[in-house]
UniProtKB/Swiss-Prot annotation:
Highest classification ranks of the organism: Bacteria, Pseudomonadati, Spirochaetota, Spirochaetia, Spirochaetales
Organism of origin: Borreliella burgdorferi (strain ATCC 35210 / DSM 4680 / CIP 102532 / B31)
Its biological purpose: Phosphodiesterase (PDE) that catalyzes the hydrolysis of cyclic diguanylate (c-di-GMP) to pGpG.
Domain of life: Bacteria
Keyword presence, Hydrolase: yes
Keywords recorded for this protein, A-Z: c-di-GMP, Hydrolase
Name this protein carries in UniProt: Cyclic di-GMP phosphodiesterase PdeA
EC id: 3.1.4.52
PANTHER family, per database record: CYCLIC DI-GMP PHOSPHODIESTERASE PDEB, CYCLIC DI-GMP PHOSPHODIESTERASE PDEF
Keyword Hydrolase part of the UniProt annotation: yes
Reaction catalysed by this enzyme: 3',3'-c-di-GMP + H2O = 5'-phosphoguanylyl(3'->5')guanosine + H(+)
Main enzyme class: hydrolase
Length: 670
């Protein structure tokens, strides 16, 4: 009987700059339903991918560094949710093996025994809306034992650490290993813990934490662990089980009951915390005391979604309840969404880091269920001594939180005197090195956001946005990228890449979307370079694109020091019909002089004014005044950061010409 293949009905493409050998083609056709062979991922337009239901891309990596293919795979995943198999003999960082949407093999023959694993990873990747994110974030979980079970409680996936350490029966033909084969017991009663229930039978418990367990490993080794069970309940996959070592001690002491101090005022001198600790000295004997600062930042997409006060209350309620369910300790509220948590433990730094990660993961999962999208979740930690003045500890705790944000995965960070500048510089250097690599290999990805006309006689536009994803496929915050690009004078290199890419995509985008006017961001620092000015002018003139459909956006920051050069250059571009826009108008100190002198067609009012238009009479008056002045010069106004109907009503009242923001369109790959 022939073995049933998981891929025969899965449409796939091959990306290869060279001709694929006959042997490889035959093997691939026996595994995949191949649709096409292309030389570049640029041939895979979103419409084509959807029409052909393409799920896999087989990427041949010839001669170039593996990062080049990883970047292609990341673009395919972000734009079209395609899973990639990279064939490469190049050496690569083992971190790439943790990527859920990529498999790397040296030769086609490896597919013979990796089919099942690849299919499983693809299944996980396609179900990211579920609690599978807990599994997909293997960068944090990979050091622990991870198990996936089906609805029959059979183990269908176990990671390397689990297979090496768990005392399981040897797998033979017809012998299915079940979760009941794992010897895990209650620490005190030594009763075997039942992991064989069906998660659908207890829907109120989507995520379960079982603490203080005794796990028997190979060679009869005993381990003190916590178990985290996460419900999946999709595609015959029932639950995910994570087993985490917590301590070598005989017993973790019970925590005291939680007391919430919910003060709206920021803690200035920490006397409130100090008083609490002194009054409960008996609780903390023989234990180390730690303060944890939990700092949550939301994506802009969610941050402007609803009333901010209601949103903050919702976030704090989730954070309180989840911390209370894990650790009965004390919580202080700071401004915004910051919480300070007091936790005592006898397990040292390793244990407090483990606790912080557990808090972070549990809260993140709770946010996900409420469709709250987190941009960053940083945790700073500092050990405190009852004899010390806590006034001097709080600023250091905030520094630890800042350091946490510099780590790629925002790992919880314990404050140490030698840490701050060294860590920040180290991580900035990593990002800078990656930017250099991105410039060399053209890793930047173009996104776009629609600019909507608010008057009948105007046409829609789009703004071209630049995004950079790291080697794990995660977006690097733009402020980090462009601060370093400006700092190290790389604006010319980046702007050159963006201009070339935008013009290359123009015809394809217009044919699919019907929007003809492109707005491309140019740094004023790039315009200092005569070579760049010549390149930009000549490239636009040779592009065969109607020049009246091209708009160049320049931020007002940086214009003043090169004002004469930029003004003269703008006059030249304007003579060719190219449109010019001034971005972030109002953020500088000499804005009005720009309106009088520069030959601009559009003003984009700084978002800080638009966001406050309903709450600040001053901002409303400023916008109204800018509009009046612009009208005298026949300059059109674009309002950025329009994220709700209330703001829209105000800008329509002011007769603003265009609106841009999440109310209409979220940025997406071009």
């Amino acid at each position: 009987m022939n073995k049933v293949n998981n891929y025969q009905n899965i449409n796939s493409v091959i990306i290869s700059k060279k001709e694929v050998g006959l042997r490889d083609l035959i093997k691939l056709k026996s595994i995949f339903n191949l649709i096409q062979i292309v030389k570049s991922e640029k041939a895979l337009y979103s419409e084509y991918v959807k029409q052909n239901n393409i799920k896999f891309a087989i990427i041949y990596n010839y001669e170039k560094p593996i990062d080049f293919s990883i970047n292609i795979a990341n673009e395919l995943k972000n734009a079209n949710k395609i899973h990639s198999i990279i064939i490469s003999k190049e050496k690569f960082d083992e971190e790439y093996l943790k990527l859920d949407h990529i498999e790397i093999i040296k030769d086609i023959s490896e597919l013979e025994y990796k089919q099942s694993l690849i299919h499983q990873k693809k299944l996980f990747c396609d179900n990211k809306n579920t609690t599978l994110d807990f599994f997909l974030n293997l960068s944090e979980l990979i050091k622990e034992i991870v198990i996936i079970t089906n609805t029959k409680n059979e183990i269908i996936y176990i990671n390397e650490k689990g297979s090496k350490n768990l005392n399981l029966p040897m797998k033979t033909s017809g012998n299915i290993i079940k979760v009941t084969d794992i010897d895990i017991r209650d620490w005190e009663k030594l009763e075997k813990i039942n992991l064989s229930y069906h998660t659908n039978s207890i829907p109120e418990f989507k995520n379960i934490l079982i603490t203080d367990c005794l796990l028997t490993l190979k060679n009869n080794k005993k381990l003190h662990v916590d178990i985290f069970i996460s419900t999946i309940a999709q595609n015959n996959i029932d639950k995910l089980i994570t087993i985490k070592e917590i301590s070598n001690s005989n017993k973790i002491e019970n925590y005291k009951y939680l007391e919430i101090i919910d003060s709206q005022d920021e803690i200035q001198n920490a006397k409130e915390i100090e008083k609490l600790l002194v009054n409960h000295m008996d609780i903390y004997k023989k234990k180390s005391i730690y303060l944890l600062n939990l700092d949550v930042s939301l994506t802009a997409e969610y941050e402007y979604k609803e009333d901010q006060e209601k949103l903050n209350a919702k976030i704090l309620k989730i954070m309180y309840s989840k911390i209370m369910s894990l650790y009965s300790e004390y919580i202080f509220k700071l401004k915004h969404n910051n919480l300070i948590v007091i936790i005592s433990t006898s397990g040292g730094e390793k244990r407090i880091i483990s606790i912080a990660k557990k808090i972070k993961k549990t809260i993140a999962l709770a946010f996900k269920k409420e469709d709250i999208i987190i941009f960053k979740f940083n945790i700073g930690i500092i050990e405190v001594n009852l004899k010390e003045n806590l006034e001097f500890k709080i600023p250091k705790l905030m520094m630890a939180t800042k350091i946490s944000s510099e780590y790629k995965e925002s790992n919880p960070t314990i404050y140490k005197e030698e840490l701050p500048e060294a860590v920040i510089l180290k991580n900035q250097n990593k990002i800078f090195q990656y930017i250099l690599k991105a410039i060399k290999n053209d890793f930047f990805t173009l996104y776009y956001q629609k600019i909507n006309p608010l008057k009948k006689n105007l046409k829609p536009k789009i703004e071209i946005l630049t995004r950079l994803f790291d080697h794990m496929g995660k977006p690097i915050p733009n402020n980090q990228i462009f601060n370093l690009i400006d700092k190290y004078n790389l604006t010319v290199e980046v702007d050159t890449l963006v201009v070339k890419k935008a013009l290359r995509e123009y015809k394809s985008f217009v044919s699919k979307n019907g929007i003809h006017i492109f707005s491309i961001n140019i740094s004023p620092y790039s315009l200092k370079s005569q070579n760049f000015r010549i390149f930009l002018r000549d490239t636009l003139l040779k592009s065969q694109i109607p020049l009246q459909n091209i708009c160049l956006e320049i931020t007002e920051t940086g214009i003043l020091e090169n004002f004469e050069i930029i003004n003269k250059y703008f006059q030249e571009l304007k003579s060719f019909g190219i449109k010019l826009a001034l971005d972030d108008f109002g953020s500088g100190h000499t804005s009005l002089s720009y309106i009088k002198t520069l030959p601009i067609d559009l003003l984009k009012i700084d978002g800080s004014f638009i966001k406050a238009i309903n709450s600040s009479e001053i901002d409303f008056v400023i916008i109204k005044s800018i509009k009046k002045i612009a009208d005298t010069k026949n300059i059109k106004i674009i309002a950025e950061f329009v994220y709700n109907e209330e703001i829209l009503k105000k800008i329509i009242e002011l007769e603003i010409d265009y609106g841009q923001g999440f109310l209409w369109h979220k940025p997406e790959p071009i």
